[in-house]
UniProtKB/Swiss-Prot annotation:
<dbReference type="GO" id="GO:0006412">
    <property type="term" value="P:translation"/>
</dbReference>
<dbReference type="GO" id="GO:0019843">
    <property type="term" value="F:rRNA binding"/>
</dbReference>
<dbReference type="InterPro" id="IPR005727">
    <property type="entry name" value="Ribosomal_uL22_bac/chlpt-type"/>
</dbReference>
<dbReference type="GO" id="GO:0003735">
    <property type="term" value="F:structural constituent of ribosome"/>
</dbReference>
<dbReference type="GO" id="GO:0009507">
    <property type="term" value="C:chloroplast"/>
</dbReference>
<protein>
    <recommendedName>
        <fullName>Large ribosomal subunit protein uL22c</fullName>
    </recommendedName>
</protein>
<keyword id="KW-0934">Plastid</keyword>
<comment type="similarity">
    <text>Belongs to the universal ribosomal protein uL22 family.</text>
</comment>
<comment type="subunit">
    <text>Part of the 50S ribosomal subunit.</text>
</comment>
<dbReference type="GO" id="GO:0015934">
    <property type="term" value="C:large ribosomal subunit"/>
</dbReference>
<dbReference type="InterPro" id="IPR001063">
    <property type="entry name" value="Ribosomal_uL22"/>
</dbReference>
<keyword id="KW-0699">rRNA-binding</keyword>
<keyword id="KW-0150">Chloroplast</keyword>
<dbReference type="Pfam" id="PF00237">
    <property type="entry name" value="Ribosomal_L22"/>
</dbReference>
<dbReference type="InterPro" id="IPR047867">
    <property type="entry name" value="Ribosomal_uL22_bac/org-type"/>
</dbReference>
<dbReference type="InterPro" id="IPR036394">
    <property type="entry name" value="Ribosomal_uL22_sf"/>
</dbReference>
<keyword id="KW-0687">Ribonucleoprotein</keyword>
Length: 143
């Protein structure tokens, strides 16, 4: 491998480390709720502050709000413990729901038949960022 290529790889590693220090990701895999129902909640909290989102999730009547609440709480705990983020300055920069595996079960019916029951799962991803770090990293124009 040429020295130019090694230098480029090293530069990419350092760039990824810088990005990793400014955000915290939390994943919930195989949550037993349909992706469509979880997206209904996720779409309402994307881009909001951490404190505002906790209030919203506590008041929402949807079943999907509890696993999302737990995941958000976990992400904030990781951010404050590992990177020293203040919870008041954190906001949700990215929140997405993807479909997971479908659990298939059989429901017995009359005359020896059976119907298929599909139990959908989903994967939830939440990324928290700190507003103060983003303000410091953006360059200001000199005019």
């Amino acid at each position: 491998m040429s020295s130019w290529r090694k230098a480029k790889k090293s530069e990419q590693k350092h760039r990824l480390k810088r990005i990793a220090r400014t955000r915290v990701q939390a994943f919930a895999r195989d949550v037993r709720i349909s992706a469509h129902k979880a997206r209904r909640v996720i779409d309402q909290i994307r881009g909001r502050s951490y404190v505002e989102t906790l209030t919203l999730l506590e008041l929402m009547p949807y079943r999907a709000s509890y696993p999302i609440f737990k995941l958000l709480y976990s992400a904030a705990a990781s951010a404050s413990h590992n990177l020293g983020f203040k919870e008041a300055d954190s906001y949700i920069s990215k929140a997405e729901v993807n479909e997971g595996a479908v659990l298939k079960r059989l429901k017995p019916r009359a005359r020896g038949r059976s119907y298929l029951i599909k139990k959908p799962t989903c994967h939830i991803t939440i990324v928290l960022k700190d507003r103060t770090l983003n303000e410091m990293s953006t360059p200001t124009s000199l005019s």
